C-alpha cells in the first residue's frame, strides 16, 4: 500500500514513519527544502524517543521517502494525509489556510481516485471545506475523478508519540463512503492485531472527538 503524508512536523513525521514501520510505502512531503534535505540526511526537526532510529531503518529499507513535490508524491498513493499546521487565527480559532491549500493542490495534481484524510487538529466541518477546495480544482480541470474525504484525529502525547501510534488505545476514523472505510481499515490493520479498537463513525463525530 502506498500513502503520502503532507507536513513533516510532529504529527506528520510520526504518522509517516510508523506506517512505514509496518510495511507501508510512505512519502512525507514538506514545502521546506532545507527540512527535506535534512530529513534525507537523517537530521530530524523534532525529538521523539525512538523516532530517529525508526526513520533511519525505514529509509534504508526504502519504505520511507521525503520530498518537496506533492505532485510526484501522490502518484499511485491510495491515501493522502494532511498533517500541516493549523496555527490559531486572530480570534483564536484554527487557521485552515495550509490545510485547504494542500487540499487544493491535491485536486490540481491527482490522477486517480484517492482518500484524503485530515490528521491535523481541526474544527468540526473542516472535512467539508477540504472536499470543496479539492472539488473546485477538479471542476476547474474539467475532471470527474472520484475522491473520498475522511477524518482521523491524532491522540499523540509529546515524548510518547511513537508508543501512542504503534500501540493506540483507540483509532478514530470518520468516513461517509464505504470505499474510504475499506481503505482506512486496510491501512490500520497492523495496528489492530493486539485487539486495539478502531471506531468508524461519521465525519463530524470523528472531528468532535478531539474536543470531547
Task: Label the model's feature ranges.
Residues 1-212:
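Structural/interface elements that position substrates and couple domains in central-metabolism enzymes
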Amino acid at each position: 500500500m502506498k500513502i503520502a503524508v503532507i507536513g513533516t512536523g510532529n504529527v506528520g513525521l510520526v504518522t509517516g514513519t510508523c506506517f512505514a514501520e509496518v510495511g507501508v510505502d510512505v512519502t512525507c512531503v514538506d514545502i521546506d527544502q532545507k527540512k527535506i534535505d535534512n530529513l534525507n540526511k537523517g537530521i530530524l526537526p523534532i525529538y521523539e524517543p525512538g523516532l530517529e532510529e525508526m526513520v533511519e531503518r525505514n529509509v534504508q529499507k526504502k519504505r520511507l521517502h521525503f520530498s518537496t513535490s506533492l505532485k510526484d508524491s501522490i502518484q499511485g498513493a491510495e491515501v493522502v494525509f494532511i498533517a500541516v499546521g493549523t496555527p490559531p487565527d486572530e480570534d483564536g480559532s484554527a487557521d485552515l489556510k495550509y490545510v485547504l491549500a494542500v487540499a487544493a493542490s491535491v485536486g490540481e495534481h491527482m490522477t486517480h481516485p484517492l482518500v484524503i484524510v485530515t490528521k491535523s487538529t481541526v474544527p468540526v466541518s473542516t472535512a467539508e471545506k477540504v472536499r470543496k477546495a479539492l472539488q473546485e480544482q477538479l471542476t476547474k480541470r474539467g475532471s470527474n475523478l472520484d475522491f473520498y474525504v475522511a477524518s482521523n484525529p491524532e491522540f499523540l502525547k509529546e515524548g510518547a508519540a511513537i508508543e501512542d501510534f504503534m500501540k493506540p488505545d483507540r483509532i478514530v476514523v470518520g468516513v461517509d463512503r464505504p470505499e474510504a472505510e475499506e481503505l482506512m481499515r486496510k491501512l490500520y490493520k497492523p495496528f489492530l492485531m493486539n485487539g486495539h479498537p478502531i471506531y468508524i463513525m461519521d465525519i463530524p463525530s470523528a472531528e468532535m472527538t478531539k474536543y470531547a
